[in-house]
């Protein structure tokens, strides 16, 4: 069985390890932990992680964030992956740094990547893992904040949070969304 695990982010070295690129960071950590490397393909960088007979196609879209839906649709069609086997990993301003929340569906919460995915897929009924990046910015400073780098305090727990996010993605594929939400959302 195949799953598409999409980490949202922006391409380019200027966005490397910025808050808005936490989706890329989760997939990079998951690939690194399994000695995998990404290859450049159409609409994104991919690698495949096999876990207990399940194929997890990890996708870092090469489109800009607000065009992420194009990459998601392309890889779903190319690999014949149903919507219920898709997980989007995204940054979330509404959650404190490091908080992880798996949801089976929901609004885009003002996130342009999720907004475009919903527009292209014609539904908001897809799983998403929200990775809290906090919201410690002055009024009007949202863009600078999400495109900014993590604090030294954030980095103290980053590896553990990235590892947990990877475990959530694997559990999504192995145990399903309901069991995974019950297991991880309370932490």
Curated annotation (Swiss-Prot):
Entry keyword annotation includes Cytoplasm: yes
Primary subcellular site in the record, as a coarse category: cytoplasm
Recorded GO MF terms: peptidyl-tRNA hydrolase activity; tRNA binding
Residues at the site labelled Stabilizes the basic form of H active site to accept a proton: 91
Catalytic reaction list: an N-acyl-L-alpha-aminoacyl-tRNA + H2O = an N-acyl-L-amino acid + a tRNA + H(+)
InterPro entries for this protein: Pept_tRNA_hydro, Pept_tRNA_hydro_CS, Pept_tRNA_hydro_sf
UniProt xrefs under Pfam families: Pept_tRNA_hydro
Protein name listed in UniProt: Peptidyl-tRNA hydrolase
PROSITE patterns tied to this protein: PEPT_TRNA_HYDROL_1
Active-site residues from the entry: 20 (proton acceptor)
């Amino acid at each position: 069985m195949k799953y598409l695990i999409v980490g949202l982010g922006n391409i380019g070295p200027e966005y490397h390890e910025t808050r808005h690129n936490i989706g890329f960071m989760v997939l990079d950590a998951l690939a690194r932990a399994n000695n995998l490397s990404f290859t450049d393909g159409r609409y994104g960088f991919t690698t495949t992680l096999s876990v207990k007979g399940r194929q997890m196609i990890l996708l870092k879209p090469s489109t800009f964030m607000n065009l992420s839906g194009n990459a998601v649709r392309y890889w779903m069609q190319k690999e014949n992956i149903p919507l219920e086997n898709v997980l989007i990993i995204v940054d979330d301003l509404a959650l404190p740094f490091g908080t992880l929340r798996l949801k089976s569906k929901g609004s885009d919460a003002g996130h342009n990547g999720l907004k475009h995915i919903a527009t292209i897929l014609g539904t908001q009924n897809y799983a998403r893992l929200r990775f809290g990046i906090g919201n410690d910015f002055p009024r009007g400073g949202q863009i600078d904040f999400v495109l900014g780098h993590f604090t030294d305090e954030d980095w103290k727990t980053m590896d553990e949070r990235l590892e947990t996010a990877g475990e959530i993605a694997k559990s999504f594929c192995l145990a399903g969304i309901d069991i995974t939400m019950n297991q991880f959302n309370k932490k």
